[in-house]
Amino acid sequence: MSEQLKIKAMRAAGVGCVLMLMIIALVVFMLPTGILIDYLTLAGSWVGGGTTFGILMLAALPPLTGAIFYYFWKWVLK
């Protein structure tokens, strides 16, 4: 694989990560605190935990989105 292709895929990963951070910021600042905590608790309960698990899942979204964008972009440019 050429270096140029890897660089383009890394740029796409960065864009994906920034987009996810912007979406998270909008949701966090627009929702009332009680509703946000309820959503995080609900997400955490889906995996057998509580609010902390929901927060950790939320924190894992930007790198996960970046990885998806990276591999998808590598596949598209192949």
Curated annotation (Swiss-Prot):
Membrane topology: Multi-pass membrane protein
Superkingdom as given in the UniProt entry: Bacteria
Broad class of where this protein is predominantly found: membrane
Spans through the membrane: 13-35, 50-72
Compartment list: Cell membrane
Record keywords, A-Z: Cell membrane, Membrane, Transmembrane, Transmembrane helix
One GO term describing the cellular component: plasma membrane
Protein name, as recorded: Uncharacterized protein PM1237
Organism: Pasteurella multocida (strain Pm70)
